[in-house]
């Protein structure tokens, strides 16, 4: 009903998740208000638009199966050799509001997905979208209903891939930008709320990740921020790493903060500041008591650390720094500057 199909359609063979039989596929592709322009492209989705050659928007709907008419509602392809694959997807809201611009891109069992570029794939990025089953009294009413449905479902799977060769599988509300980045989750344990940007980054089973750079590897991590290259975070949460590493360095502790080139943190909650710094001292370190020339026996927080140390160097490799421009301390746990020590001597 109300559909338009322009171009030659004589191809028979595999296209996306469908085996194309030209006559049958062409007939099934005449969905409500769908638009197809291009050679051997096929569109099975209400209000879907397909422009270019050898694209397919696939569904199992043939006018009689009521489980499939919502599939691919409002989906869009502009380019060639792209596929929005919903025919073999189990979810009847697969393909809803998917958009592809470019060449040789693919979505499968996903909705609310956006792809721009070439050779990108988004699979199994899907949540329920309460797409309308009737058009309402006007196009404006239908559009308003769709906007509300998308908003209430947080955009569906809402995964975006911009660039080339990016892959996302079992992700939600995730943006993948650049070249050859991969983000994966699992059924029922999707990787969600992530931003991965750069080249050759890999993330698996992550939540609330921000990774910007190249050749970073993150797995089983939450609330992690990486800006740099050659960093690896495994089974650790709340890490903040800013700065690149010449060779891959690994953080496996929670709450690590590493800022600078070639910085490393090996203790939970440790902080490494400055190029080449390593944080290796854990909480529980006891201060030296000058009155007894021995470690203090006082276990209060004044004498015994309750969190891991802040390192500004690496004494094992003769990397040491001064801390300059320090005001005189006031409280028992404040730093003392040289001026105060001179007063003690006087």
Predicted regions and their residues:
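Glycine-rich, low-complexity segments
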Residues: 340-346
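Glycine- and small/polar-enriched repetitive beta-structure motifs of secreted/surface proteins
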Residues: 1-325, 333, 339
């Amino acid at each position: 009903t109300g559909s338009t199909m322009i171009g030659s359609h004589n191809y028979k063979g595999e296209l996306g998740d469908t085996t194309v039989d030209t006559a049958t596929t062409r007939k099934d592709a005449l969905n409500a208000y769908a638009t197809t322009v291009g050679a051997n492209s096929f569109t099975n989705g209400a209000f879907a638009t397909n422009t270019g050659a050898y694209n397919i928007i696939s569904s199992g709907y043939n006018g009689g199966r009521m489980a499939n008419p919502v599939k691919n509602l409002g989906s869009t392809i502009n380019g060639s050799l792209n596929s929005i694959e919903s025919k073999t997807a189990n979810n009847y809201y697969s393909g809803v509001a998917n958009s592809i611009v470019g060449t040789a891109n693919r979505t499968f069992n996903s909705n609310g997905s956006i792809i721009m570029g070439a050779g990108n794939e988004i699979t199994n990025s899907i949540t329920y979208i309460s797409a309308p089953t009737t058009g309402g009294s006007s196009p404006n009413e239908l559009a308003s209903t769709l906007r509300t449905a998308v908003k209430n479902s947080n955009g569906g799977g809402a995964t975006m891939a911009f660039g080339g060769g990016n892959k996302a599988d079992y992700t939600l509300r995730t943006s993948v930008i650049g070249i050859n980045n991969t983000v994966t989750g699992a059924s029922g344990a999707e990787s969600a709320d992530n931003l991965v940007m750069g080249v050759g980054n890999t993330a698996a089973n992550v939540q609330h990740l921000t990774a910007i750079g190249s050749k970073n590897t993150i797995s089983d991590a939450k609330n992690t921020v990486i800006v740099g290259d050659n960093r690896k975070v495994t089974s650790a949460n709340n890490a903040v790493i800013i700065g690149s590493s010449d060779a891959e360095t690994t953080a496996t502790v929670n709450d690590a903060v590493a800022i600078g080139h070639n910085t490393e943190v090996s203790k939970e909650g440790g902080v490494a500041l400055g190029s080449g710094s390593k944080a290796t001292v854990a909480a529980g370190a006891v201060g030296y008591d000058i009155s007894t020339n021995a470690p203090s026996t006082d276990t209060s927080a004044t004498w015994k650390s309750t969190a891991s140390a802040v390192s500004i160097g690496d004494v094992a490799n003769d990397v040491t720094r001064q801390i300059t421009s320090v005001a005189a301390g006031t409280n028992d746990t404040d730093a003392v500057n040289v001026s105060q020590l001179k007063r003690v001597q006087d």
